[in-house]
Swiss-Prot record:
The lineage of its organism: Bacteria, Pseudomonadati, Pseudomonadota, Betaproteobacteria, Neisseriales. Belongs to the RimP family. It is found in: Cytoplasm. This is Ribosome maturation factor RimP. GO terms for cellular component: cytosol.
Length: 149
């Protein structure tokens, strides 16, 4: 059986999930053969959503001859990764931690409020300052949830 490259798997996921009403947040294929798929939608993810996607993807991967040992479907969690411009638009007003590939004013790590994203440039405010970060310069970005007690 053909294991499938990451690109093949990504293409299948990007074509399949939107038709089911879900967004592909990320996926990973471990050395042990576990395929983890992180999904989301506006109203959040339930256990039933994970089961629905798992059943559907199992069939799709069988047809596409993609082999894996275990398939795990999950929500991305409260600290979900931010990868696309649409993620930064959707979560404008929320806090995030962003690590850049190249420093901006001598700094590579930013924790602040996402102000928005236009023309593939994310605007983040922190410590009374505002910085603009090109999407291509973002190495990692995650939401940073606030817990108020």
């Amino acid at each position: 059986m053909y294991i499938g490259s990451s690109m093949d798997i990504q293409t299948i996921l990007e074509k399949t999930l939107p038709g089911l009403g879900y967004e592909l947040v990320d996926f990973e294929l471990t050395a042990q053969g576990t395929l983890r798929v992180f999904i989301d939608k506006e109203s959040g993810i339930t256990v039933e959503d994970c089961a629905t996607v798992s059943n559907h993807l199992s069939r799709v991967f069988m047809v596409e001859d993609i082999d894996y040992k275990n398939l795990e479907i999950s929500s991305p969690g409260l600290d979900r990764p931010l990868k696309k411009a649409a993620d930064f638009v959707r979560f404008a007003g929320q806090n995030a931690k962003i690590k850049t590939r190249l420093p901006i004013d001598g700094q590579k790590n930013f924790i602040g409020k996402i102000e928005g994203c236009e023309n593939d440039t994310v605007t983040v405010s922190f410590d009374g300052k505002t910085v603009q970060i090109e999407l291509g310069n973002i190495d990692k970005a995650r939401l940073r949830p606030e817990f108020k007690f």
